[in-house]
Amino acid sequence: MEIHGFNKTTLLDYPEHIAATVFTGGCNFRCPFCHNGELVLDPAGQPSVSEEEVLSYLKKRQGILQGVCVTGGEPTLQRDLRKFLQKIKELEYPIKLDTNGYMPGVLWELLQEHLIDYVAMDIKASRDNYARAAGLPHMDISRIEESIGILKSSGIPYEFRTTVVKGIHTVGEFKEIGRWSCILLAELSGE
């Protein structure tokens, strides 16, 4: 597992949990406002943290820490993510996953295997402005919509969040995000 950061204690990253946060490298988006740009653009240039170091710390903190947040970059791009999450689960920690939602198949598999307990998914912009906000010339927006549907029917707690950026987001943009969300959620509910 490619780990490029480890915050040993956080009160912010996993709602209602004292948690540790693991940062993965790499991302399939190029958001111009990314707050972890170095993990996205140059993961190999960032210090590495071994999986063993993380797991050893988590084992020592059992009974003190209440969960683990896995973030990035984009964790769902990591080929060893599933195995890593299984090892955390063996330590009996609940896991929160932060994701951009562009890998719905991975999200589905992790949910089916009960490897994640909470998901925070970014909604970058309205449907029409998504590619620009994600820093991609072209993208398949249906993958975002599929992930929203997967989370809605997952039975686990989740949140959708938007990083507000001047020049990308306006009041009108947020109204469009709201309209799109309502339409999509109504379609998913069969209404």
Q: Where are the model-predicted features located?
A:
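Conserved AdoMet/S-adenosylmethionine-binding subsite of the radical SAM
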Residues: 55-67, 76-191
